[in-house]
Amino acid sequence: MIFERVVRPRLFRLGNGDAETAHEFTVRRLAGLARVPAALAVLRARYGVSAPRTVFGLRFPNPVGLAAGMDKNGVALPAWPALGFGFVEVGTVTAHPQPGNPRPRLFRLPDSRAVVNRMGFNNAGAGALAARLAALPRPLGVPLGISLGKSKVTPLEEAVEDYQASYQALRGYGDYFAVNVSSPNTPGLRALQDRAHLDALLAALVGEKPVLVKIAPDLPDSAIAELLEVCLARGAAGVIATNTTLARDGLAPADQAGGAEAGGLSGRPLAQRAREVVSFVHTETGGRLPVVGVGGILTPDDAERMFDAGASLVQLYTGFIYRGPALVRAAAAAARTP
């Protein structure tokens, strides 16, 4: 309640309401806290929840994780487990450093509890992330996922080599890797969800560490089924469902102007479709392919419904923006019984 009544209004006023300014401020502050062990201990005592489960060979202290995009460069890593997250996914990171799309590129739709982003994989590059992870003073204590994307300067026909370069730089640090082939903000990226492209990509990456595929909610079920065939045939460890959507269904009237911004939509309007995709993946694969459910989780009930749809784990991004760490704790507590 303190977050929603006091902290969030102040964050939302930063930079004259610019969402990315608030995001950067939050990550900087958490990076500062991450260097203070006593502060981390206080946060852990308040927000930590034990609800362990093992998925794709990894033990998770609880099944509620931080989605990619919140801490792209891993600058605040020790803070996220202290806020209750049972795993953390950094990135999306690319082989080449890149600035992303021009600002403004992140927009809040508060009445809809949603966000539109067209960030464009802004990140410092795989090499910089590897150096930061190598310098961590102690183990994170939760599984670390690393989301990999294609560099904008890399042509589609060289995508496999681009992903491989990032993987090779980071394979010693990630507990699992997420292949992001579904962001709507990198031209041509979603073509990598096609059978031939995805088959070549997974053939190059699957092996040493668990590799998951992050899919778009805008794919028809027939295309998802084809993608799942490739994942099973190539030994992918799981699927992350879903990325942001290009659809604009379910927006509140006051958010129509913000919703007209180009980019991917996340948050409450995505919840139903994300659950549908999770359920489809779980049913289509007979539970053989673990699913990480992400999209529209803003309450503990939303998390429970995602688990009921077939998710083994869930991730938060937009829900964390609007509800803060109390949502992490409540969602993890609701998941104590798998």
From Swiss-Prot:
One GO BP: 'de novo' pyrimidine nucleobase biosynthetic process
Q: How does it sit in the membrane?
A: Peripheral membrane protein
What EC designation does it have? 1.3.5.2
Kindly list the positions annotated as binding substrate.
72, 117-121, 180, 185, 243-244
Catalyses which reaction(s):
(S)-dihydroorotate + a quinone = orotate + a quinol
Which keywords describe this protein according to UniProt? Cell membrane, Flavoprotein, FMN, Membrane, Oxidoreductase, Pyrimidine biosynthesis
Subcellular location per the Swiss-Prot or TrEMBL entry: Cell membrane
Q: Where are the transmembrane segments?
A: none
Q: In which pathway does it act?
A: Pyrimidine metabolism; UMP biosynthesis via de novo pathway; orotate from (S)-dihydroorotate (quinone route): step 1/1
What does the record give under GO molecular function?
Answer: dihydroorotate dehydrogenase (quinone) activity
Q: Which PROSITE patterns match?
A: DHODEHASE_1 (PS00911), DHODEHASE_2 (PS00912)
Superkingdom, natural source: Bacteria
Q: Where does FMN bind?
A: 68-72, 92, 147, 180, 214, 242, 267, 296, 317-318
State the InterPro entries in the record. Aldolase_TIM (IPR013785), DHO_dehydrogenase (IPR050074), Dihydroorotate_DH_1_2 (IPR012135), Dihydroorotate_DH_2 (IPR005719), Dihydroorotate_DH_cat (IPR005720), Dihydroorotate_DH_CS (IPR001295)
Q: What class of enzyme is it?
A: oxidoreductase
The record describes how the cofactor is bound as: Binds 1 FMN per subunit.
The answer on whether this UniProt entry bears the keyword Cytoplasm reads: no
Q: In this record, what's one Pfam family?
A: DHO_dh
GO CC terms in record: cytoplasm; plasma membrane
Biological role stated in the UniProt entry: Catalyzes the conversion of dihydroorotate to orotate with quinone as electron acceptor.
Q: Which NCBIfam families match?
A: PRK05286.2-5, pyrD_sub2
This protein is called what?
A: Dihydroorotate dehydrogenase (quinone)
Q: Which organism is it from?
A: Salinispora tropica (strain ATCC BAA-916 / DSM 44818 / JCM 13857 / NBRC 105044 / CNB-440)
